[in-house]
């Protein structure tokens, strides 16, 4: 969902947003991106089998449904195919696409794999997830859209961050949201992480403090976005922009209220309740991409 949303956010016009070059650039980027996601999540499961037997026993490797050997073949094949597709086409293999793929592969590898295994260190683990969810995915695929679909053949990730406010702000928003999800993910996993000596913030500080801190941070983020776009809607003379900004504002405020309401019935010490809430945040994460093209 992120890739189409960022292509439409970068579009200079409604006609360009639904043109053949745009749709082609989207599809070409989505295939290696899905393969890279398979590599990163698969590698994490391969290296966390013993922990997952405690925290997430239903995952395929932990449950014995997929052998470690077959899993390794799958993730390595996904990595090679993903990176190969990134450079296979002279036009669609943009700098933005390759930054997204290589950056995700690098951070995903050192996050899970020894001797680095950055997930053992709270600050470094959070940095990896924020970097991928924020700058790498958003700015890189925005740059890919500009280069592959909208004629800015020399578009770079840093250039788009510096030149396009929508690119910078979307990267900032999803970077903060990514931080919330990264830290909230560890709250229901405290028992297994403590046994494996993975000192997440939830293990160090306590699941209750992390849960409430992340709930507050995310609700403030949504309310700030809602207020900002409401002000933008009131100050523009364009009917179209006012409508887009109003819809973005209402969506953000409703999402912020949802973050607070759903948290009221959650016991931070109950791993199942926290996991359900964590999955609710993922729904809001992807719904935010659904609204993103309106954020102008």
Pin down the residues of each PLM region:
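Multi-pass alpha-helical membrane architecture of UbiA-family
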Residues: 1-296
């Amino acid at each position: 969902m992120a890739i189409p949303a960022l292509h439409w956010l970068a579009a200079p016009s409604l006609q360009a947003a639904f043109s053949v070059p745009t749709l082609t650039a989207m599809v070409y980027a989505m295939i290696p991106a899905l393969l890279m996601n398979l590599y990163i999540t698969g590698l994490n499961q391969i290296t966390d089998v013993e922990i997952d037997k405690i925290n997430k026993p239903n995952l395929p490797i932990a449950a014995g449904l997929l052998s470690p050997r077959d899993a390794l073949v799958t993730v390595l094949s996904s990595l090679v195919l993903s990176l190969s597709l990134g450079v296979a086409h002279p036009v669609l293999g943009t700098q933005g696409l390759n930054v997204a793929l290589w950056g995700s592969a690098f951070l995903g590898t050192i996050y899970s794999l020894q001797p680095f295994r950055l997930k053992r260190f709270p600050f470094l683990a959070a940095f990896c997830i924020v970097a991928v969810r924020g700058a790498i995915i958003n700015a890189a695929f925005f740059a890919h859209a500009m280069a592959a679909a909208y004629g800015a053949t020399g578009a770079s990730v840093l250039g788009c961050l510096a030149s396009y406010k929508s690119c910078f702000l979307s990267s900032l928003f999803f970077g903060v949201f990514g931080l919330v999800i990264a830290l909230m993910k560890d709250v229901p996993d405290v028992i297994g992480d403590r046994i494996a000596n993975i000192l997440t913030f939830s293990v160090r500080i306590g699941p209750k403090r992390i849960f409430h801190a992340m709930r507050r941070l995310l609700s403030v983020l949504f309310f700030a976005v809602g207020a900002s776009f409401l002000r933008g809607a009131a100050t523009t003379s364009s009917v179209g922009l006012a409508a887009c900004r109003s819809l973005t504002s209402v969506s953000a405020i409703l999402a912020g209220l949802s973050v607070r309401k759903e948290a009221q019935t959650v016991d931070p010490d109950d791993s199942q309740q926290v996991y359900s809430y964590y999955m609710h945040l993922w729904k809001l994460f992807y719904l935010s991409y659904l609204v993103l093209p309106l954020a102008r």
